[in-house]
From Swiss-Prot:
Superkingdom in the source lineage: Eukaryota
Protein name from the UniProt record: Potassium/proton antiporter CemA
Keyword presence, Aminoacyl-tRNA synthetase: no
Membrane-crossing residue ranges in chain numbering: 75-95, 210-230, 311-331, 359-379, 395-415
Pfam families on file: CemA (PF03040)
Record's keyword terms, sorted: Antiport, Chloroplast, Hydrogen ion transport, Ion transport, Membrane, Plastid, Plastid inner membrane, Potassium, Potassium transport, Transmembrane, Transmembrane helix, Transport
Protein source organism: Marchantia polymorpha (Common liverwort)
Function, as annotated: Contributes to K(+)/H(+) antiport activity by supporting proton efflux to control proton extrusion and homeostasis in chloroplasts in a light-dependent manner to modulate photosynthesis. Prevents excessive induction of non-photochemical quenching (NPQ) under continuous-light conditions. Indirectly promotes efficient inorganic carbon uptake into chloroplasts.
Length: 434
């Protein structure tokens, strides 16, 4: 009895799969219709909040893409479950009729359920067909028309070869942004749209923060993971085999050779000193001393041979890391725009004192009084990482010129951009700097 009941539950679950999958796709299509109805509320957020136009656009586009993905995934599950049911029906011809099984089979052929399924499928098909035209008309054409009307206040999306050009933040116009936002909030209060706008703005802020943090995590972990995977699985065994078999040289640079010779001279002098301190000059055997020096020479050769392999490995690993990071920047232009907007909003939401504090902290770290010593350590580490000679003249030349260039760039950014956005930040910065 229990066995038959378990079989009946399995059959019931399998035959219910098409209805559940179709219901998921139907709810996702309803979600698309809701996003399209709430489109004008999203558009009002632009005038009543600090959100950038790109963040709103990418939020709407992401929600639509998620719903479309759920629809296609549910329809695939629907087709697979129908295929499984057909297999059950075919195999049922080879077995004896089961009363429980017969109770389930007629449910598939009910006319009402068939009509309901056909209506839902037609609704989903019409929603997907309408979505592309809706996107072209509202997400592109209407945005471009709004850009022409409000170009004195904001910078919107621009159309170029049917593609979107990313703009990081709202531009400065003749009318201050605080006035337009206050007017838009007052208008929303009059039309009883404040609660819905707050909810939409919260969802948009949540999406913007999550998308930015995910992109930062991808920029940090994916290049490291890819380079580490290639290093351990492919590059390290291949380079060791290639260097030890096909390369006769041991030292990759002259700096390594000079360093090894100095080390060998120090070892030989230490051996002579140890023998002289232990025995008299007449009892020192040159053969034993030569064997010990020869053994230390072999160990030094092995050490510097491994160092040469590590230098080549570091070069290829860093190249893979750079290529992976460049691909992430190229493929993630939309996320980069959102990250730029989110970072600017975080910066502009701070008080003038905190803004000036972070600017001073960054400038003092890079071009402050103690920064040349830090730059010397960084450059020396980079030279040792790639196996180059530790040249004091090159390091001093770089340290004496590069911070000056950075100082010029910082001053240009402060007086060019911050002076336009918020003159009080520049005044606070000069006060704290003095």
């Amino acid at each position: 009895m229990k066995k038959n009941f378990s079989y009946w539950r399995i059959f019931h679950h399998i035959f219910a799969l098409p209805y559940c999958s179709l219901e998921k796709a139907y709810k996702a299509s309803k979600r698309i219709q809701k996003i399209k109805k709430d489109y004008f509320l999203y558009k009002n957020i632009l005038f009543s909040s600090k959100r950038s136009w790109q963040s709103i656009l990418f939020y709407i586009d992401t929600e639509l893409n998620n719903s479309v993905f759920k629809i296609y995934l549910s329809l695939l599950e629907y087709k697979l479950s129908l295929w499984l049911i057909q297999l059950f029906l075919i195999f049922s011809l080879f077995f004896k009729k089961n009363s429980k099984f017969d109770l389930i089979l007629p449910n598939i052929n009910e006319k009402k359920k068939k009509r309901k399924i056909n209506r839902k499928l037609a609704w989903i098909r019409a929603t997907l067909n309408d979505l592309e035209s809706w996107r072209r008309y509202y997400l592109f054409s209407s945005f471009l028309s709004l850009d022409k009307k409000e170009k004195n206040n904001f910078s919107f999306l621009q159309m170029k070869s049917s593609r979107l050009t990313a703009i990081a933040y709202e531009s400065i116009g003749l009318v201050p942004r605080s006035i337009t936002r206050t007017f838009s909030r007052f208008k929303a209060e009059l039309t009883n749209q404040s609660s819905s706008l707050v909810l939409k703005e919260f969802r948009l802020a949540k999406y913007q923060a999550l998308a930015s943090l995910q992109y930062i995590g991808c920029l940090f972990f994916i290049p490291l993971g890819v380079s580490f995977f290639f290093q351990k699985c492919f590059l390290e065994p291949w380079i060791q085999n290639w260097w030890n078999i096909y390369q006769s040289q041991i030292f990759l640079t002259s700096f390594q050779e000079e360093k090894a010779l100095k080390k060998l001279q120090e070892i030989e002098e230490l051996f002579w000193l140890d023998k002289v301190m232990t025995y008299s000059s007449n009892k020192i055997q040159l053969q034993d001393l030569t064997k010990e020096i020869h053994q230390q020479t072999i160990e030094l050769v092995q050490i510097y041979n491994n160092d040469s392999i590590k230098i080549v490995l570091h070069l290829l690993t860093d190249l893979i890391w750079f290529i992976t990071l460049s691909c992430l920047f190229i493929l993630g232009k939309e996320r980069l725009v959102i990250l730029n907007s989110w970072a600017q909003e975080l910066f502009y939401s701070l008080s003038d004192t905190m803004k000036a504090f972070f600017i001073l902290l960054l400038t003092d770290l890079c071009i402050g009084f103690h920064s040349p010593h830090g730059w010397e350590i960084v450059i020396s580490s980079c030279l040792e990482h790639f196996g180059f000679v530790h040249n004091k003249h090159v390091i001093s030349c770089f340290v004496s010129t590069f911070p000056v260039i950075l100082d010029t760039v910082f001053k240009y950014l402060i007086f060019r951009h911050l002076n336009r956005i918020s003159p009080s930040i520049v005044a606070t910065y000069h006060t704290m700097n003095e």
